From Swiss-Prot:
Tagged with keyword rRNA processing: no
Record keywords, A-Z: Ribonucleoprotein, Ribosomal protein, RNA-binding, rRNA-binding
An example Gene Ontology CC term for this record: cytosolic large ribosomal subunit
Family matches, as InterPro entries: Ribosomal_uL14, Ribosomal_uL14_bac-type, Ribosomal_uL14_CS, Ribosomal_uL14_sf
Entry's family note: Belongs to the universal ribosomal protein uL14 family.
Organism: Dechloromonas aromatica (strain RCB)
Gene encoding the protein: rplN
Molecular function per GO: large ribosomal subunit rRNA binding; structural constituent of ribosome
GO biological process, one term: translation
Regions annotated as coiled coil: none
Described function: Binds to 23S rRNA. Forms part of two intersubunit bridges in the 70S ribosome.
Gene3D superfamilies attached to this UniProt entry: Ribosomal protein L14 (2.40.150.20)
Protein name: Large ribosomal subunit protein uL14
């Protein structure tokens, strides 16, 4: 469950280390984002020679949440922290590698690239 001002780890190799959610996209009064939702983020901490700089604003897709996601069979998939993957304006991943597991809920046509780059799909 991600809302405005939530800080997330970055699960790709763009050079960003942590980001802050500045808007949950999809609806004028939408408050929360879950796994697979697109959010607007600001870079809060970045590596010196990365692709992105501190203060830049990007789209991102949420790939892991501490709240987790409920499956139709009743099981719950949860993670230790919140993580996102940075996207460009065409909603394609900026990085070329994904770190850590992602959930099966990302297997939509929009995010198949992220699923194929991920080392583990839960």
């Amino acid at each position: 469950m991600i809302q405005m001002q939530t800080t997330l780890d970055v699960a790709d190799n763009t050079g960003a280390r942590s980001v802050m959610c500045i808007k949950v996209l999809g609806g004028s009064r939408r408050r929360y984002a879950g796994i697979g939702d697109i959010i607007k983020v600001s870079i809060k901490d970045a590596a010196p020679r990365g692709r992105v700089k501190k203060g830049d604003v990007y789209n991102a897709v949420v790939v892991r949440t501490a709240k987790g996601v409920r499956r139709p069979d009743g099981s719950l998939v949860r993670f230790d922290g919140n993580a996102a993957v940075l996207l460009n304006n065409k909603l394609e991943p900026i990085g070329t590698r994904i770190f850590g597991p992602v959930t099966r809920e990302l297997r939509t046509e929009r995010f198949m690239k992220i699923v194929s780059l991920a080392p583990e799909v839960l």
